[in-house]
């Protein structure tokens, strides 16, 4: 299994979060069907996800750099 920052596939940005550590939003996003992770929490103001399948993309995406062209 992989781990990494969840990434928004349309923008290339990380999922932002402000409540560090245990974070319901990150945990929910991580476990969502399209991500398939086992546990998510907030690390350095972005959602970090563990237990991801190899098919799930994580930040940074090769062709998108979040707002920078």
UniProtKB/Swiss-Prot annotation:
Which coarse location class describes where this protein primarily resides? Answer: secreted
Establish whether keyword Disulfide bond is in the entry. Answer: yes
Q: Does the keyword Secreted apply?
A: yes
Cysteine amide modification, residue list: 66
* Signal peptide start-end: 1
Q: What is any one GO biological process for this UniProt entry?
A: defense response
Q: Which GO terms describe its molecular function?
A: sodium channel inhibitor activity; toxin activity
The disulfide bonds in this chain are: 13-66, 17-42, 26-47, 30-49
State the compartments where it is located. Answer: Secreted
Task: Report the domain remarks.
Answer: Has the structural arrangement of an alpha-helix connected to antiparallel beta-sheets by disulfide bonds (CS-alpha/beta).
Please explain the role this protein plays, according to its UniProt record. Answer: Beta toxins bind voltage-independently at site-4 of sodium channels (Nav) and shift the voltage of activation toward more negative potentials thereby affecting sodium channel activation and promoting spontaneous and repetitive firing.
Name under which the protein is recorded: Neurotoxin Cex6
């Amino acid at each position: 299994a992989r781990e990494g920052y969840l990434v928004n596939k349309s923008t290339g940005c990380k999922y932002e979060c402000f409540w560090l550590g245990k974070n319901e939003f990150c945990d929910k996003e991580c476990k969502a069907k399209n991500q398939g992770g086992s546990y998510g929490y907030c690390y350095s103001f972005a959602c970090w996800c563990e237990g991801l399948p190899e098919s799930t993309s994580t930040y940074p995406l090769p062709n998108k750099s979040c707002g920078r062209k």
